[in-house]
């Protein structure tokens, strides 16, 4: 077996001359979707300063077929593990842990919100925040914009890992021959366009453990194949408030022709993370199914070829049991140590930890690669193994919106908030997505509605603990928004008080005071009040139980009041209209007084107006002004069954005008008209006219006729005419 050089590079090499620093061993573990873990052992002549090494770039290089391979990264940990004291020097042993730059994302965590970005844009933003640009995208799929995506309480690496696992993106580090001194991160999502043949080794033969005359440098020495039971389909479902009655279920069945009879098993997941976007749901189900299919048939092998590289394809020939075919390396562990001729005896180091462990069959070898591969017919996907953060408990936030607004909502009564942990949001309408607001009662065009207003503090909880699905479940008082009632002085007061918008300064209120013996219910309308009762209303005041009164029919208002009723209109008019029906006032005991400073007009368009005084008097007094009764059509009848009917005009005139028809006055005893000492009296005995002067004038004729007529003048009697006839 040929001996090819292996070098340890980096800041350590610059600290010591080549003859004062030598590599004693290294292991490198890499796998799709994982961070490469590299452990290096080395010895120096004399101690080094650990602080000069940690955090610096380091790499192990080895020569392969056609060029060099470089495994490198950042020294994340270094440990002094032992020493060998000699007469004139000290050999010191060290173990360094080396990780690629992606590992640095495990050292950073954040709470932040991404909006209207796809998964690739989010990943690139996270990389860019740390200044990392050494990656290549070999992506074939199109990724939908995520309206709202939250990182909370998780490292940057965990955050992007769970997103990639969900979307079917995986990554590896390209450290193949001639790939460059710095391993580059490759982002993949497709078996056809993301992977190429292994440089310098597109075809490799299976030789077994070898034999005389067999060159093991370019062969597979171990090969095993395993098959596993996988489910036959993946079913996902989700819910979206915009389509609440629509099923969003998607199903993806395996494309693998399984040899077992258990393909009827199903993986069911709810909620999946696609809302009503079933196209995205189908892709997610496909990714989950492909992750299962990746594990259906896997191969494990070993080779001493230094060219075999993760993320690359090779063709296996002369394999056992018909295993010839094209394969993709999805994981590899590299064991490296100096060639026998380059090794020095450091077993005499006084060590505080054991040496790196190598496979037993590596004895006498300087390199071996143990790898895991799948057929290139299978689309690799990583399993969703990175946990999502679970948003347990409650969170608080403040309602936000555009500048100058007090209430900001959409047609569904949703709001936007600013979380106190969000360092990016600007406390405006762009801080979050629209967030649903829980209510004690909701229905189609009915329920309880109270939109949280800007600057109010709200309680946020999350659907199934999903950080991407917040819901407002309540509200909280704080120092800036104190309770509406005077606590703690009046702890018995409770109720609802609103705030006039915009600008405040007024409110509507429904207040209750439960103070014993002083209980109170107060209602305030800041401006207008509308009250609609579609059947009947019963109001009882001053009693312990409801009393419907005399009328309890549908469409009725019944008011029973034990004591007084006072209505005062300080300014304006009082209109009372009965479109149909009767009005009845009954005062069983007591009096009624109506006092009007101006006019009173009563108009009865059709029907009768009846005033009945059963016992007592009826008196109408107009101190100043007029009293006018008008009947447009019909009759006016005044009836006094027992008692008197008296009309008194203290100052002014009394006029009776019958334009058409007649005026008739009838009395049982007498009718008398008086002016001063003059009178006309009509009684049962006759008609008596008395006056200081009586004039009877007939324009054409005047006739006085009776059975007996007496004309008498105590002083003088004059009978005068053009012709006077006395018979």
Language-model regions: role of each:
Residues 169, 173, 178, 184-190, ...:
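Structural signature for extended repeat/solenoid scaffolds and their inter-repeat hinge/linker regions
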Residues 66-74, 322-330, 339, 465-475:
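Short, Lys/Arg- and Gly-enriched loop/turn segments at beta-strand edges
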Residues 38-48, 293-304, 441-447:
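Short alpha-helix capping/helix-loop boundary micro-motifs
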Residues 52-53, 307-308, 452:
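Short, well-ordered loop/turn sites that connect or cap secondary structure elements
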């Amino acid at each position: 077996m040929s001996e090819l050089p292996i070098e340890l590079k980096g800041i350590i090499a610059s600290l010591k001359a080549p003859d004062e620093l030598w590599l004693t061993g290294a292991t490198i573990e890499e796998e799709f979707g994982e961070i490469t873990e590299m452990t290096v052992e080395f010895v120096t002549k004399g101690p080094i300063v650990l602080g000069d090494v940690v955090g610096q770039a380091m790499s192990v290089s080895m020569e392969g077929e056609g060029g060099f391979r470089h495994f490198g990264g950042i020294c994340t940990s270094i440990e002094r593990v032992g020493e060998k004291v000699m007469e004139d020097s000290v050999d010191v042993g060290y173990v360094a842990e080396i990780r690629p730059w992606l590992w640095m994302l495990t050292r950073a965590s954040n709470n932040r919100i991404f909006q209207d970005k796809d998964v690739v844009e989010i990943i690139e933003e996270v990389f860019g925040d740390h200044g990392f640009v050494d990656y290549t995208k070999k992506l074939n799929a199109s990724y939908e914009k995520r309206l709202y995506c939250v990182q909370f309480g998780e490292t940057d690496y965990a955050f992007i890992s769970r997103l990639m696992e969900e979307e079917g993106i995986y990554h590896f580090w390209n450290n193949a021959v001639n790939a460059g001194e710095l391993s580059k991160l490759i982002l993949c999502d497709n078996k056809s366009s993301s992977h190429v043949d292994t440089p310098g080794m597109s075809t490799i033969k299976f030789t077994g453990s070898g034999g005389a005359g067999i060159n093991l440098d370019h062969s597979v020495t171990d090969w095993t194949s395993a098959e596993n039971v996988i489910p036959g389909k993946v079913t996902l479902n989700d819910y979206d408030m915009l389509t609440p009655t629509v099923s969003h279920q998607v199903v993806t069945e395996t494309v693998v022709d399984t040899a077992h009879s258990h393909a009827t098993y199903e993986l069911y997941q709810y909620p999946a993370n696609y809302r009503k976007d079933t196209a995205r749901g189908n892709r997610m189900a496909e990714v989950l199914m492909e992750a299962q299919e990746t594990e259906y048939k896997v191969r494990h092998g070993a080779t001493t070829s230094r060219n075999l590289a993760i993320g690359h394809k090779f063709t296996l020939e002369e394999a056992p049991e018909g295993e010839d075919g094209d394969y993709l390396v999805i994981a590899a562990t590299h064991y490296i140590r100096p060639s026998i001729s380059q090794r020095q005896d450091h077993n005499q180091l006084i060590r505080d930890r054991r040496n790196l462990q190598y496979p037993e069959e590596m004895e006498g070898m300087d390199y071996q690669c143990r790898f895991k591969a799948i057929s290139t017919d299978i689309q690799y996907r990583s399993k969703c193994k990175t946990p999502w953060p679970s948003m347990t408990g409650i969170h608080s936030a403040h309602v936000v919106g555009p500048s100058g607004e007090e209430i900001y909502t959409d047609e569904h009564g949703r709001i936007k908030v600013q979380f106190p942990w969000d360092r990016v949001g600007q406390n405006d309408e762009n801080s979050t997505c629209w967030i649903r607001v829980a209510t004690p009662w909701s229905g189609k065009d009915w329920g309880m509605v109270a939109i949280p207003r800007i600057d109010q503090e709200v309680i946020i909880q999350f659907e199934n603990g999903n950080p991407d699905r917040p819901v407002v479940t309540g509200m909280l008082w704080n120092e800036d928004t104190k309770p509406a009632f005077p606590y703690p002085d009046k702890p018995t007061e409770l109720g609802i008080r609103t705030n006039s918008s915009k600008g405040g300064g007024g409110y509507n209120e429904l207040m209750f005071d439960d103070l014993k013996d002083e209980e109170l219910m107060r209602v305030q309308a800041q401006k207008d009040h509308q009250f609609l009762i579609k059947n009947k209303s019963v109001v009882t005041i001053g009693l312990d139980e409801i009393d419907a009164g005399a009328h309890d029919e549908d469409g009725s208002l019944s008011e029973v009041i034990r004591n007084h009723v006072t209505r005062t209109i300080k300014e304006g008019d009082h209109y009372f209209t009965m479109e149909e029906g009767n009005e009845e006032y009954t005062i069983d005991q007591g009096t009624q007084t109506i006092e009007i400073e101006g006019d009173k007009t009563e108009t009865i368009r059709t029907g009768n107006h009846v005033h009945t005084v059963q016992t007592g008097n009826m008196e109408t007094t107009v101190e100043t002004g007029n009293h006018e009764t008008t009947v447009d059509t019909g009759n006016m009848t005044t009836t006094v069954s027992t008692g008197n009917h008296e009309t008194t005009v203290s100052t002014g005139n009394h006029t009776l005008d019958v334009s058409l028809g007649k005026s008739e006055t009838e009395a049982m005893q007498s009718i008398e008209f008086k002016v001063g000492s003059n009178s006309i009296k009509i009684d049962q005995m006759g008609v008596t006219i008395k006056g200081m002067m009586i004039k009877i004038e007939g324009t054409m004729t005047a006739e006085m006729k009776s059975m007996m007529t007496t004309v008498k003048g105590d002083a003088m009697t004059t009978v005068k005419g053009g012709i006077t006839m006395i018979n």
